[in-house]
Design a protein with these regions (language model features):
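Hydrophobic, well-ordered secondary-structure elements that form the walls
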Residues: 29, 70, 90, 98, ...
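Short, electropositive alpha-helical surface patch
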Residues: 11-26, 78-96, 120-125, 154-163
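Ser/Thr-centric signal marking residues that sit
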Residues: 69, 78-79, 86, 109, ...
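Terminal RNA-binding accessory module
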Residues: 113-207
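Flexible glycine/acidic-rich beta-alpha junction loops that bind and position SAM and/or redox cofactors
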Residues: 8-12, 31-43, 73-80, 97-121, ...
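A structural motif corresponding to the C-terminal end of an alpha-helix
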Residues: 57-66, 93, 129-141
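Conserved SAM/AdoMet-binding glycine-rich loop
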Residues: 1-80, 91
Length: 207
């Protein structure tokens, strides 16, 4: 489920969707910053503590749900202390994936006229820190499923050269939106597109 506001996550909401077998345990829950002071300047109507509570509720409702979010670095006024708080809280949240964006000034917005605009160099540095963090957290999350037989919706396949020989590789996603690649024959690839295939998952083979 994508682009959900934290306020949407309630016990009633979770009771309703857990009763549906068509809902995948993948949630994109809006965040933008993991520091309350920054969130306040962004005019967000939630705190990081409330966000953490919503994540806990989802994790109690589903087995190993994949929770993803968006984070903006370099919002006007974001100090080193605020960014450090964001990093610390994101480490605690341990999300499946973060889409990291550098704040970009847009004319006509309140943020564009705010004091203490952050330099491009600082934005780049902070972005790289979060990109490294999310890469590590994503790898750790996916490792939980290593050795498990996972149903994968196969979406496409490629033919690659491997030691001078053509090798066919199917690509698809699990219900948690984990990318899976599987080497097989051309015939199996053609038969499996837009179908579910059980795959013994090995993270190192899906890079």
């Amino acid at each position: 489920m994508g682009s959900l506001e934290p306020r949407v996550i309630t016990e009633e909401f979770l009771d309703g969707i857990t009763a549906l077998d068509k809902v995948c345990p993948h949630f994109h829950l809006s965040l933008q910053s993991a520091c309350n002071e920054t969130l306040k300047r962004m005019n967000r109507k939630y705190t990081i503590e409330e966000y953490m509570e919503k994540c806990d509720m989802i994790r109690k409702a589903y087995d190993r749900p994949a929770i993803a979010t968006d984070v903006i670095v370099g919002f006007p006024g974001e100090t080193e202390e605020e960014f450090a708080t964001t990093v610390a809280n994101l480490e605690k949240l341990n999300l499946y994936e973060m889409h990291v964006f550098k704040y970009s000034k847009r004319s006509g917005t309140i943020a564009a006229t705010m004091e203490h605009q952050v330099s491009d160099a600082v934005k780049e540095k902070r972005s790289n820190i979060l990109l490294e963090l999310t890469a590590n957290q994503k790898a750790a999350y996916e490792q939980q499923f290593s050795g498990e037989l996972l149903p994968v919706l196969m979406e496409e396949y490629d033919c690659i050269d491997k030691d001078g020989k053509p090798v066919y590789v199917m690509k698809g996603h699990t219900d948690r939106y984990i990318l899976v690649k599987q080497e097989t024959t051309r015939e199996v690839c053609e038969q499996s597109i837009n179908a579910f295939v059980d795959v013994l998952y090995r993270p190192e083979k899906s890079k």
